[in-house]
């Protein structure tokens, strides 16, 4: 069985939806950011502040190399995983990629209370969301399937993913 890989901007529901999908299918749930934190002994925000985004992306790429060969996993990636083509090639080789989407406004509303998002620790987080989304959207669109999460519960999004995955699998994954 191929892995189910969730990509998308922060605040689109990758972790909450991923846990539901994994539970319903009996797959393991893997949050790439959690794997990074466990491997480094540091929070993501600490890695960003001490070493910068580039070093974080190097670590992320290494963790993806370790994670992807295993089967029957739901993998929730960080929002910037798409910035490195090598990550997407690996994830696609061993998985079906689902992009979770939401509008800038919805993302801002979902994230405005959080303090653990290093890329949003700026003077104007709304503008930063818009800027990052514009840069990443063409990369997110390379997913096998895109699901708009606005107005849907995590359970409804999970059901859409499972339905599409099972249709696609049909004994092949």
From Swiss-Prot:
Residues where substrate binds: 33, 57, 79, 136
Entries under PROSITE patterns matching the protein: SHIKIMATE_KINASE (PS01128)
Cellular component aspect of the GO annotation: cytosol
Compartment(s): Cytoplasm
Keyword annotations of the record: Amino-acid biosynthesis, Aromatic amino acid biosynthesis, ATP-binding, Cytoplasm, Kinase, Magnesium, Metal-binding, Nucleotide-binding, Transferase
Cofactor(s) for this UniProt protein: Mg(2+)
Transmembrane segments: none
EC code: 2.7.1.71
Enzyme kind, highest EC tier: transferase
GO biological process: one example: chorismate biosynthetic process
Taxonomic superkingdom: Bacteria
Binding site for Mg(2+): 15
Cofactor note (record): Binds 1 Mg(2+) ion per subunit.
SUPFAM superfamilies given in the database record: P-loop containing nucleoside triphosphate hydrolases
Pathway note: Metabolic intermediate biosynthesis; chorismate biosynthesis; chorismate from D-erythrose 4-phosphate and phosphoenolpyruvate: step 5/7
Binding site for ATP: 11-16, 117
Described purpose of this protein according to its UniProt entry: Catalyzes the specific phosphorylation of the 3-hydroxyl group of shikimic acid using ATP as a cosubstrate.
NCBIfam families documented for this protein: PRK13947.1
Family: Belongs to the shikimate kinase family.
Protein name (record): Shikimate kinase
Organism listed in the record: Thermodesulfovibrio yellowstonii (strain ATCC 51303 / DSM 11347 / YP87)
Top-level taxonomy: Bacteria, Pseudomonadati, Nitrospirota, Thermodesulfovibrionia, Thermodesulfovibrionales
Gene: aroK
């Amino acid at each position: 069985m191929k892995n189910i890989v969730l990509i998308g901007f922060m605040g689109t529901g990758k972790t909450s939806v991923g846990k539901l999908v994994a539970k319903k299918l009996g797959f393991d749930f893997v949050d790439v950011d959690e794997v990074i934190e466990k491997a480094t002994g540091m929070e993501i925000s600490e890695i960003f502040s001490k070493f910068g985004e580039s070093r974080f992306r190097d670590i992320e790429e290494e963790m993806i190399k370790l994670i992807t060969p295993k089967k029957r996993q739901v993998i929730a990636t960080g929002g910037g995983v798409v910035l490195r083509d090598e990550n997407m090639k690996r994830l696609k080789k061993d998985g079906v990629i689902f992009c979770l989407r939401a509008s800038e406004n919805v993302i801002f509303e979902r994230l405005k209370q959080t303090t653990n998002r290093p890329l949003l620790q700026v003077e104007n987080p709304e503008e930063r969301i818009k800027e990052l989304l514009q840069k990443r959207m063409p990369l997110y669109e390379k997913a096998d399937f895109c699901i708009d999460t606005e107005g849907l519960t995590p359970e409804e999004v999970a059901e859409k993913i499972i339905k599409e995955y099972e249709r696609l699998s049909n004994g092949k994954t």
